[in-house]
């Protein structure tokens, strides 16, 4: 399993596409930090009640969430599966000593670590934003858990599409993922809670909301269901390959 993780990390690190993602995300977060800082500090002159630090942090976290979870993670997940298809490695993996669960966990962990590396690239900007105050360490930890649960779910959705389709995979992936993020925001208020972006914004509010943890548990539950469905499909394929090998 560790060999799969290392292989996937090398695949992403050696691609110009990954370095372009790194540069684009850092540039985007830097620009949003500068714009938000100027805007909110100007606003505080006329309204001292504005919580500048918390508002800046909310904008940065929301932007990073959309960039990583909504844009970068699907690309990395689909590329991970397509690379195995191009090189016809899947059949070799299926016939190896690794179980289907280990293969899936290896692919999932590789993409999660690559996504986490993209987040780490923006760490200096978030450290700089601490000088504006307004948020607590607990906010960072809660946001990290929301990132992990949602990222896991969206990566598994991308895996499922990449294993099922041969064309327009990224288009379908973006369609589903961006719909989950944004469509609930234009629906009546109770449906807002389906959107992980709503949950993320809720985590940085001064008062805690138990719905945050309920939704995080829901994302992990749906992710587990998709994982089981992918496992069942691949296990059936592995069984067929082994039967053909015996013949």
Enumerate the predicted regions with their spans.
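Aromatic- and glycine-rich beta-strand/loop motifs that create alpha-glucan
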Residues: 1-23, 239-247
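Hydrophobic alpha-helical transmembrane segments of multi-pass membrane transport/permease proteins
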Residues: 17-41, 66-69, 175-184, 224
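Terminal transmembrane helical anchor/hairpin motif
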Residues: 39-51, 173-241
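Secretory targeting signals
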Residues: 55-59, 109-170
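Long, hydrophobic alpha-helical segments
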Residues: 57-83
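Transmembrane helix boundary and interhelical loop/hinge segments in multi-pass membrane proteins
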Residues: 73-94, 107-108
């Amino acid at each position: 399993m560790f060999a799969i993780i290392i292989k996937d990390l090398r695949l992403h690190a050696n691609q110009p596409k990954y370095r372009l993602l790194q540069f684009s995300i850092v540039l985007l977060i830097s620009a949003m930090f500068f714009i938000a800082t100027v805007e909110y500090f100007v606003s505080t002159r006329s309204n001292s009640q504005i919580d500048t630090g918390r508002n800046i942090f909310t904008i940065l976290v929301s932007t990073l969430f959309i960039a990583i979870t909504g844009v970068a993670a699907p690309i990395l997940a689909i590329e991970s599966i397509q690379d195995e298809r191009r090189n016809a490695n899947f059949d070799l993996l299926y016939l190896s000593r690794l179980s289907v669960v280990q293969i899936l966990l290896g692919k999932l962990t590789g993409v999660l670590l690559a996504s986490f590396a993209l987040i780490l690239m923006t760490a200096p900007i978030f450290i700089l934003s601490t000088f504006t105050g307004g948020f607590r360490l607990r906010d960072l930890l809660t946001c990290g858990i929301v990132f992990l649960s949602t990222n896991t779910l969206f990566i598994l959705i991308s895996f499922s599409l990449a294993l099922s389709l041969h064309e327009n995979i990224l288009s379908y992936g973006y369609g589903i993922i961006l719909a989950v993020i944004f469509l609930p925001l234009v629906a009546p208020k109770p449906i807002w809670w389906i959107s992980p972006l709503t949950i993320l914004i809720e985590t940085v509010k001064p008062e805690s909301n138990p719905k945050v943890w309920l939704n995080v548990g829901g994302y992990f539950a749906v992710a587990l269901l998709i994982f089981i469905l992918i496992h069942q499909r691949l296990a059936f394929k592995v069984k067929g390959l082994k039967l053909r090998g015996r013949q």
